[in-house]
Swiss-Prot record:
Monomer. Homodimer and homotetramer; disulfide-linked. Mainly monomeric but also detected as part of homodimers and homotetramers. Interacts with 14-3-3 proteins; regulates the phosphorylation of NGB. Could interact (ferrous form) with G-alpha(i) proteins (GTP-bound form). It holds the Pfam family Globin. Keywords: Cytoplasm, Disulfide bond, Heme, Iron, Metal-binding, Mitochondrion, Oxidoreductase. One of its GO terms (molecular function) is metal ion binding. This is Neuroglobin. It catalyses: Fe(III)-heme b-[protein] + nitric oxide + H2O = Fe(II)-heme b-[protein] + nitrite + 2 H(+). Its EC number is 1.7.-.-. Heme b binds at residues 64, 96. Belongs to the globin family. GO terms for cellular component: cytosol; mitochondrial matrix. Phosphorylated during hypoxia by ERK1/ERK2. Phosphorylation regulates the heme pocket hexacoordination preventing the association of His-64 with the heme metal center. Thereby, promotes the access of dioxygen and nitrite to the heme and stimulates the nitrite reductase activity. Phosphorylation during hypoxia is stabilized by 14-3-3 proteins. InterPro entries: Globin, Globin-like_OT, Globin-like_sf, Globin/Proto. Residues 1-149 form the Globin domain.
């Protein structure tokens, strides 16, 4: 896999980093639009959400959004040395597998990430920026997928 363009990723992430919860909410709203079957996977204290809006407004889910955005931020920070995150990301993959996430759903998460970036960046979301983020996300998912492979 080609290495992502670090400067394009860092520069575009600066805009997102200013309001990670807001942009993360856009990402997950899009995810639930594209793959509504994921909603039941998010249960906190045995509470099932009746709608994406119910989920997106819950304090527990907002905490999950913050954590996801922090993982993305960590990947951006380490974009030139993603191998340093491989063990952590494989563990994260294993946790997702344990709660019933299918590896195939990460394709939809990637689409949702690109959607969020496009909404946040507007005209600055160029084909080169899109390609750089696709490469970064692909590398992250590749590392996370090791959590599905091994025990």
């Amino acid at each position: 896999m080609e290495r992502p363009e670090p400067e394009l990723i860092r520069q575009s992430w600066r805009a997102v980093r200013r309001s990670p919860l807001e942009h993360g909410t856009v990402l997950f709203a899009r995810l639930f639009d594209l793959e509504p079957d994921l909603l039941p996977l998010f249960q906190y204290n045995c509470r099932q959400f009746s709608s994406p809006e119910d989920c997106l407004s819950s304090p527990e889910f907002l905490d999950h959004i913050r954590k996801v955005m922090l993982v993305i931020d960590t990947a951006v920070t380490n974009v030139e040395d993603l191998s340093s995150l491989e063990e952590y990301l494989a563990g994260l993959g294993k946790k997702h597998r344990a709660v019933g996430v299918k590896l195939s759903s990460f394709s939809t998460v990637g689409e949702s990430l690109l959607y969020m970036l496009e909404k946040c960046l507007g005209p600055a979301f160029t084909p080169a920026v899109r390609a750089a983020w696709s490469q970064l996300y692909g590398a992250v998912v590749q590392a996370m997928s090791r959590g599905w492979d091994g025990d």
